[in-house]
Amino acid sequence: MARIAGVDIPRDKRVEIALTYIYGIGLTRSRQILAKTGINPDTRTRDLTDAEVAALRAVVEGEYQVEGDLRRQEAMNIKRLIDIGTYRGRRHRLNLPVRGQRTRTNARTRKGVRKTVAGKKKAPAKK
């Protein structure tokens, strides 16, 4: 199994797809990396030579921010928004949708499971 950026790449998949197992690399970026290294996207990971794996590793770790560094940068960006008190930062802090979606209905993924609010009780009947 090839190991790139601290991630074990699956052996039986095409290299184009296998690279997407690295956080921060999608299909488009995977194709760009393969074009830079000159590797055929249809090659299976198990068929890569050590030189090709080394070339992939050099491009991924040298030119792109992936895995832990990328996660850390995203967390710091969100923390910065919260610290300077922006509207987006406040939405992150309250676990509400950040990009202007409605919250009266929907937004269940972001808000979590419903918190049931008891209805107003009727006053007991007087005789």
From Swiss-Prot:
UniProt-listed GO biological process terms: translation
UniProt biased composition (Basic residues): 101-127
Pfam annotation, one family: Ribosomal_S13
Keywords: Ribonucleoprotein, Ribosomal protein, RNA-binding, rRNA-binding, tRNA-binding
Entry GO MF terms: rRNA binding; structural constituent of ribosome; tRNA binding
GO cellular component: cytosol; small ribosomal subunit
Disulfide bonds: none
SUPFAM superfamilies named among the record's database cross-references: S13-like H2TH domain (SSF46946)
Region (Disordered): 100-127
Subunit structure: Part of the 30S ribosomal subunit. Forms a loose heterodimer with protein S19. Forms two bridges to the 50S subunit in the 70S ribosome.
HAMAP family according to UniProt: Ribosomal_uS13
Stated role: Located at the top of the head of the 30S subunit, it contacts several helices of the 16S rRNA. In the 70S ribosome it contacts the 23S rRNA (bridge B1a) and protein L5 of the 50S subunit (bridge B1b), connecting the 2 subunits; these bridges are implicated in subunit movement. Contacts the tRNAs in the A and P-sites.
Family to which the UniProt record says this protein belongs: Belongs to the universal ribosomal protein uS13 family.
Protein name: Small ribosomal subunit protein uS13
Organism (species): Synechococcus sp. (strain JA-3-3Ab)
Gene: rpsM
